[in-house]
């Protein structure tokens, strides 16, 4: 892989921060090391001294005085070593990337912790995209991604999708505008990457099948583009047999995968992680060095202690409990939809995630109905146009989340929605 063509001039110009490098050395060095290098505040001056956090089953995470000093201090930009090590083993266990033992320059699997997967994705986009570059994604798409891409001045090319995710024939048809060898010629402007949420796509709830992933990956190899696998709902697949990931089939080192703890442990702790080829992950880490410096040390230690306490088996048991909860929530919103929206709208059963994507019949644009009329009735949902490149275009779709509302609240919300639809027809 020629990674240089996926790195902008600004990203290529980034050099390691000497101060951040010293922080990395200190974090891995013996406690006897005397440091006069970094501007680390004296931890004895921090007002917080200890903490005890109670978790499931009455177990506790302890922050004694020494641990608290570390938790409140600067830490390596890539993440604290014990969390990185645990996550690397998790990725090997779940995905077994072919690139684990590749030479670093040839795309060896690397990993870094980010302040939520959104931060990682933004830095990946900024690393790759020059104004005018072509990028591929499937609409409707996560609005946060669209808002990240628009200011970068890229051309977003929509790839058709259905209930099984991206349609490979649509991708193949788009790529036929170029010849495979055009990827070696910057003037041809071949697509830099394909972005997709493969499981429980936000907002549709669609999931890519294994067969389609294989077809898509082969097209990526043929036309030499990256795949950005944004997978925050990987652990919320209602069928607990998890579909193989792009990372698991990445023989070239062309997949950048974004994972998140937001949906299964905590959204407020803002801990996610990127996995991908070392030459690209290194560029992201260099960007972190001069922006946020590093993810929260305290939050990383809290999650790391929990994961080490659980072990992989305990972690997966927790994931199963989370899946069972959201599966019941999904059943509740589907029951409410069947009860109130039959004949007024159409939808399909989400394969993963926490959203129901609804198409209202007979109404070309539901924006006013959702943003004004429903709000006045005390019901909040999102109009579908927020998930398209052209957000000003009319859309008959809306997104309803089933993550937090009770079954009774979902029932009331859809009763209100049904009433408003009938009044608008």
From Swiss-Prot:
Gene Ontology terms: biological process: 2-oxoglutarate metabolic process; alpha-amino acid metabolic process; biosynthetic process; glutamate metabolic process; kynurenine metabolic process; L-lysine catabolic process to acetyl-CoA via saccharopine
Transit peptide: 1-29
Subunit structure: Homodimer.
Catalytic reactions of this protein: glycine + 2-oxoglutarate = glyoxylate + L-glutamate; L-kynurenine + 2-oxoglutarate = kynurenate + L-glutamate + H2O; L-kynurenine + glyoxylate = kynurenate + glycine + H2O; 3-hydroxy-L-kynurenine + glyoxylate = xanthurenate + glycine + H2O
InterPro entries: Aminotransferase_I/II_large (IPR004839), Class-I_PLP-dep_aminotransf (IPR050859), PyrdxlP-dep_Trfase (IPR015424), PyrdxlP-dep_Trfase_major (IPR015421)
Record note on temperature dependence: Optimum temperature is 50 degrees Celsius.
Cellular component terms per the entry's GO annotation: mitochondrial matrix; mitochondrion
Primary location class: mitochondrion
Protein name according to UniProt: Kynurenine/alpha-aminoadipate aminotransferase, mitochondrial
Subcellular location: Mitochondrion
Modified positions (N6-succinyllysine) in chain numbering: 263, 339, 367
Activity control: Kynurenine transaminase activity is competitively inhibited by aminoadipate, asparagine, glutamate, histidine, cysteine, lysine, 3-hydroxy-kynurenine and phenylalanine.
A Pfam short name: Aminotran_1_2
Residue numbers bearing the N6-(pyridoxal phosphate)lysine modification: 263
Cofactor names: pyridoxal 5'-phosphate
Function recorded in the entry: Transaminase with broad substrate specificity. Has transaminase activity towards aminoadipate, kynurenine, methionine and glutamate. Shows activity also towards tryptophan, aspartate and hydroxykynurenine. Accepts a variety of oxo-acids as amino-group acceptors, with a preference for 2-oxoglutarate, 2-oxocaproic acid, phenylpyruvate and alpha-oxo-gamma-methiol butyric acid. Can also use glyoxylate as amino-group acceptor (in vitro).
Tissue: Higher expression in the liver. Also found in heart, brain, kidney, pancreas, prostate, testis and ovary.
Comp. bias regions, Polar residues: 198-208
Residue(s) carrying N6-acetyllysine: 69, 179, 263, 339, 367, 422
Positions of region (Disordered): 181-208
Record-stated family: Belongs to the class-I pyridoxal-phosphate-dependent aminotransferase family.
pH dependence as annotated: Optimum pH is 7-9.
PANTHER family for the chain: AMINOTRANSFERASE, KYNURENINE_ALPHA-AMINOADIPATE AMINOTRANSFERASE, MITOCHONDRIAL
Key words of the record: Acetylation, Aminotransferase, Mitochondrion, Pyridoxal phosphate, Transferase, Transit peptide
E.C. no: 2.6.1.39, 2.6.1.4, 2.6.1.63, 2.6.1.7
GO MF annotation, one: kynurenine-glyoxylate transaminase activity
